[in-house]
Amino acid sequence: QRQMCIRDRQYNIPEIGIEPGRSIVGEAGITLYEVGTIKDIPGVNKYVSVDGGMSDHIRTALYGAQYEALLVNRNEKANESVTIAGKLCESGDIIVRDAQLPSSVHRGDYLAVLSTGAYHYSMASNYNQMQKPSVFFLKDGKAREVIKRQSLRQLIINDTK
């Protein structure tokens, strides 16, 4: 009845848009990375590089956002503080500072970076010619790909015309 009264008087009914943001969807996402090179500088730091970086995880570099990472392919206790770095050859290409991982972490291991459900994909870029990653939804133990990984052809299509 109220809507009819508003329309009869030719008032516009306002529309409300909602942007869910980190508080709602942030915890719903996990980003998986494969470990590449590991560089241990005794007495300074241990760097664990992964197959992604600031092109798909920019919030640490932009805002100093903090994340937690877990080794997911083996059940071992975390006993060492490391820096998880991306592969983009930038000093700011850091995924997680002071990550707690097992000292046995090695090339080929998989790390899960938690709480990446908000903004990670929407802020992803092709910086350094990096392909945007795929996105999967999980429900009842089953994975469904909802966004395919960007192909090399898609990446360079505008550069080849």
Task: Name what the model sees in each region.
Residues 7-11:
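Structural alpha-helical segments in enzyme catalytic/regulatory domains
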Residues 13-161:
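Charged (often Lys/Glu-rich) extended helix/loop segments that serve as interaction or gating elements
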Residues 1-6:
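Short, small-residue-biased leader/transition segments that mark boundaries at the very start
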